[in-house]
Amino acid sequence: MAKFDAHLKCSFCGKSQDQVRKLIAGPGVYICDECIDLCNEILDEELVDGQGNSRHSHEPSRKAMPAARKSSKPAPTLASIPRPQDIKSFLDQQVVGQDAAKKVMSVAVYNHYKRLAWQGDGQGETEETATRLHKSNILLIGPTGCGKTLLAQTLAEMLDVPFAVADATTLTEAGYVGEDVENILLRLLQKAEMDVDQAQRGIIYIDEIDKIARKSENPSITRDVSGEGVQQALLKMLEGTVANVPPQGGRKHPYQDCIQIDTSQILFICGGAFVGLEDVVQKRMGRNAIGFMPSDGRGRSRANRDLQAAQVLRHLEPDDLVRYGLIPEFIGRMPVSAVLEPLDESALQSILTEPRDALVKQFRTLLSMDNVQLQFADDAIEAIAQEAHRRKTGARALRGIVEELMLDLMYDLPSQTSVKEFTVTRAMVEEHTGGKVLPLPGAEQQKTA
């Protein structure tokens, strides 16, 4: 036993039991009196620093924290802000359809950045500029894969501002396991490279906002830490407050250095599918159908059902969102709302070919690097769109289908140097037999997209 004790050493500094005055044992670890004294010194110095009596803190803990920095970019000016029609034209290049939602977002974003430029001019002494302009956050309602996130991303790209995406399902009320709402601001700050001024002019998109709806219309009598509790925690951030953001993320704790961010200039865009919301609207209107939505869905195509659901949501009122599960205070902080329509087969075909980064163009570019000219027959484009519409996941289904179709082609074509041109046909889409690189009879006569 004496021989075993001689090999005991501190788990932190590595000194043996003979080199220190005291060695304290824990469950599988040991710590010496010198390491304990060092820990006490670190805690005492940080405590004094937090009270403002000293600016000396332990150097290692300072080095681990990213520091906020001042912005080198000027605030936007009225002349530099694109007009609503210019914003919509830019959105048209990336997002197919959704004209009503594009118009709503273009005007809302234009007014938001006009407000920032107006405040940045330093002319607040006159009677005209003394009027305070409040921001208008945006609520996007639409089925999955209809372009909600892409709209927000395209806006941020055009305006050259930091853009962060957060998932509402990961947020919990303070004091519970999960992410604090302040972590959303940390993501925006990281996108701005820790530039606070730039982050305060950014855009935050909170996805799956419908998933934090409370379970019933009545206020909860028990803790709903990932539903109503998160809505309550988001209220001040959406309205505008100075939030303390921990630079390393995670939970805040006393004496922790935080970065202060003013959220009054941050544009919040919340999006969600809100499945079943059309039923709430119909119930409010007092009947199972409102003239164009028969109660018996037999015999109706899915395209007609989706179109009719979108028509129902045009009659949406704030009370319907309250009945769905959002609290009135939360709805009041999202004054601008836009309903996105589900994508039909025609829109899905356009998504495949028209946008700047369309899937067809991407795969053509990839195969052109192997000196192969790839073509998609018109009926193949139609078949892909039909399959994507059947899968009910919107535009997201397109990439999955095309990836499945092109897998074997992308594997074989680079090795077959004799093949200079290849056309994807409808039969290949329907049977997913694109793996065999065979000459297609009459391929050159096929009308291609």
UniProtKB/Swiss-Prot annotation:
One of its GO terms (molecular function) is unfolded protein binding. ATP binds at P143, T144, G145, C146, G147, K148, T149, L150. Residues 1-51 form the ClpX-type ZB domain. Disulfide bonds: none annotated. GO terms for cellular component: HslUV protease complex. Residues 50-83 are annotated as: Disordered. It comes from the Bacteria. GO terms for biological process: cell division; proteolysis involved in protein catabolic process. The keyword ATP-binding applies. Zn(2+) binds at C10, C13, C32, C35. Keywords: ATP-binding, Chaperone, Metal-binding, Nucleotide-binding, Zinc. InterPro entries: AAA+_ATPase (IPR003593), ATP-dep_Clp_protease_ClpX (IPR050052), ATPase_AAA_core (IPR003959), Clp_ATPase_C (IPR019489), Clp_protease_ATP-bd_su_ClpX (IPR004487), ClpX_bact (IPR046425), P-loop_NTPase (IPR027417), Znf_CppX_C4 (IPR010603). It holds the Pfam family zf-C4_ClpX. NCBIfam families: clpX (TIGR00382), PRK05342.1 (NF003745). Belongs to the ClpX chaperone family. ATP-dependent specificity component of the Clp protease. It directs the protease to specific substrates. Can perform chaperone functions in the absence of ClpP. Component of the ClpX-ClpP complex. Forms a hexameric ring that, in the presence of ATP, binds to fourteen ClpP subunits assembled into a disk-like structure with a central cavity, resembling the structure of eukaryotic proteasomes. This is ATP-dependent Clp protease ATP-binding subunit ClpX. It comes from Synechococcus sp. (strain CC9605). The gene is clpX.
